[in-house]
Amino acid sequence: MNRRQFHAGAAGAILLEMLPGCAGTVTQSKGAHLATVDTHAHIFRRGLKLANVRRYAPDYDATLNDYLGMLDRHGIARGVLVQPSFLGTDNSFMLAGLRQAPGRLRGIAVVDPDTPFAELKKMNEAGVAGIRLNLVGGAPVPDFWSAPWHTLLTRAADLGWQVEVHREARDLPRILPPLLNAGVNLVVDHFGRPDPALGVNDPGFRFLLETGASRRVWVKLSAAYRNGADGAGEKTALAAIPLLRNAFGMERLMWGSDWPHTQFEKSIDYGRARKMLDIWLPNPDERKVVLVDTPTSLFRFA
């Protein structure tokens, strides 16, 4: 299947070899796959209407059937479809996917602040469990203290939704406070996106750790490769894990594959992304919390 198979190249193999304990020594606990949840994946196909403002657009398809097959091959019971940035606020393809596998999937939508409550309720009925603020790559940060945003955030809280934040760590100190003030639960993507040069010493990442005391912030252990090239992101992940554990507890951490690893298809694949969690968390009891208990509750699979 050429690119659609998303095979990892030699560079990805080198990254794993750089990390301790990678030589096939870590195995998944028996039975854990029965209820495991992948909390971060995207589906799309060529020909869909693209957002007017976008950083990129893939030149291949990543369909629902592709994703469900990937889950099956890796023993993952459930998945969460996150609206891709390049599709903007047109969530129709993602919603169609949710309706085809209602018991197995949940969704995270991207919406405008003036989206009618009735439309949000329809999304909720389809399996949407939250909204995403994809602000990475220099996108302007909205005024989340403003009335339109406060209304949206309040409605999200009323629905029991989470708000997922994707932004470089340096800006988290000005983004997270108004969101927490609105009363919603927050999920921060990809280890909080610390600066590759600073790693866990990034002041924004340190601020993220402080929000653990709120008990309303979760962090995705996902896409470490987006936080630094040539293995730097993976090394930052290893350094971040004990800090995140201490600040949030295992019950506020989740794993996501980030499939189909857009813009990194040649250096990572699904199996490698899943194995990274075994490296980060060699304790099977901790992995069960991250893979099963926490996402099952937060995404309302139970």
Residue ranges with predicted function:
Residues 5-18, 23-35, 60-78, 243, ...:
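Mid-to-C-terminal alpha-helical segments outside catalytic/metal-binding sites
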Residues 40, 71, 94, 156, ...:
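Conserved, mostly hydrophobic/aromatic
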Residues 145-254:
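Catalytic pocket-lining loop regions of alpha/beta-barrel enzymes
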Residues 54-82, 87-100:
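Alpha-helical scaffold segments that flank or form the walls of functional sites
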Residues 88-170, 177, 220-224, 231:
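Active-site gating/metal-coordination segments in enzymes
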Residues 37-41, 80-81, 107-109, 131-133, ...:
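Hydrophobic faces of well-ordered beta-strands that scaffold small-molecule active sites
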